[in-house]
Amino acid sequence: MTLARLAPLAALLLAACAQFQPPPPEPDPLPDLMRQQTSLPQGGGVFTAGGSLSLTSDNRAFRPGDVLTVVLEETTQASKQAGTSFGKKSGAKIGPSLIGNTTFNAQVGIDANRDFNGSSSSTQQNALAGSLTVVVHRVLPNGLLQVKGEKQLTLNQGEEMLRVAGYVRVEDIDTDNRVSSLRIANARIGYSGSGALADANSPGWLMRFFASPLMPF
C-alpha cells in the first residue's frame, strides 16, 4: 500500500530530473556539393565554356563551387492576446396556496449564478545579426542558386553552430559578393549552442519539477 502511494511522487521526481533536450536539427534540404562539369577545349583553344571568366564580368557568385557572404538581418516579433468572459444567471420562484386561501404562503425560491473570466497574452521577439560565407551547390535552370554553409565556433565555454541554406537570385548579390538574408528564398537559418553558457539558460531540477506535465496543479 505504501509503494502505491509513493508511485505518483516517484513519477513526478523522475519527470523533474529529465533534461530538456533541444530538438534535433532538421535534415539538410540541399544536396551535397556537385562537381562542376567542364567541357574540353576544342580547336586548340585555351579557355573553356564552363570554367573561363569574362573580362567584362564581375566577381559575383554564379557557378557551383563559388562562395558568397550572407549578411544576417533577421528580426521577428510576435504578440498574441486572448480574453474570454461569460456568465449565466437563472432564478425560479414558486408561491403555492392552500385550497385557494393565500393565508398559507410557502414561497420557494431558487437562484443560480455562474461567472467565468479568463485572459492570456504572449510576446516573443528574436534578432540575429552577423555574416556567414556559404557555397553555391547548384544552379537551377531558371538561374536560382542553391547555397548552403555553416560555421562552428569552439569556445572555452562551449560550442556554437550557425547554419544557413536556401535559394538566392544572382540579381540580389551586390558588387561586394554579399546578399542579405532577407533575400534568401526558403531560408533555413539555425543557431544553436552547447556548453556552460547554454546550460545556464536551462531551468534547474526543482523548476522542471513544477513545470512537469504530470504536475496536477
Swiss-Prot record:
It is found in: Cell outer membrane; Bacterial flagellum basal body. A lipid is attached at residue 17 (N-palmitoyl cysteine). Keywords: Bacterial flagellum, Cell outer membrane, Lipoprotein, Membrane, Palmitate, Signal. It is a lipid-anchor. GO terms for biological process: bacterial-type flagellum-dependent cell motility. Its main location: membrane. InterPro entries: Flag_Lring (IPR000527). GO terms for cellular component: bacterial-type flagellum basal body, distal rod, L ring; cell outer membrane. NCBIfam families: PRK00249.1-4 (NF001304). PANTHER family: FLAGELLAR L-RING PROTEIN. Assembles around the rod to form the L-ring and probably protects the motor/basal body from shearing forces during rotation. Belongs to the FlgH family. This is Flagellar L-ring protein 1. It comes from Chromobacterium violaceum (strain ATCC 12472 / DSM 30191 / JCM 1249 / CCUG 213 / NBRC 12614 / NCIMB 9131 / NCTC 9757 / MK).
